[in-house]
């Protein structure tokens, strides 16, 4: 019997969610930072995909990791905590704050939360969960 080659590190799914597409667009901007406002799963799913193009993207890509209560009642506290740390430790050329599917459903005003944080750098905010489409739709949304 012939030896079979294994391709275990190959991801055959080429259409990830819109959150990943938007993060990929901003990941291509020098010194841009990205915050995925959503569950840890969404962050790691996108991170795994983005690492293929930029193995050091985790330095510029963060997740808020809201708990179950926040996903129901709002992620403002989680997002403000992440934004405060970012403001103290970094100076990005631009910041993307994007909501995942679950957080998009509760209707948090992430642009309002970003204004409350008084960030000293340009900030772009939008919902980019998979409910709006796949990778391509997220990339197009980010490019607007």
Q: What annotation goes with each model-predicted range?
A:
Residues 1-144:
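An N-terminal assembly and electron-transfer interface module characteristic of large anaerobic redox
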């Amino acid at each position: 019997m012939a030896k079979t080659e294994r391709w275990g590190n190959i991801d055959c799914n080429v259409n990830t969610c819109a959150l990943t597409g938007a993060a990929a667009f901003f990941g291509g901007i020098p010194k841009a930072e990205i915050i995925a406002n959503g569950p840890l799963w969404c962050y790691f799913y996108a991170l795994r995909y983005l690492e293929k193009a930029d193995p050091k993207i985790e330095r510029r890509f963060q997740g808020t990791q809201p708990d179950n209560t926040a996903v129901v009642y709002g992620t403002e506290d989680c997002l403000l905590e992440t934004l405060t740390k970012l403001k103290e430790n970094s100076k990005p050329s631009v910041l993307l704050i994007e909501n995942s599917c679950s957080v998009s459903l509760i209707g948090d005003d992430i642009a309002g939360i970003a204004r409350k944080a008084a960030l000293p750098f340009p900030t772009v905010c939008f919902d980019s969960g998979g409910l709006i489409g796949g990778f391509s739709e997220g990339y197009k949304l980010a490019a607007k």
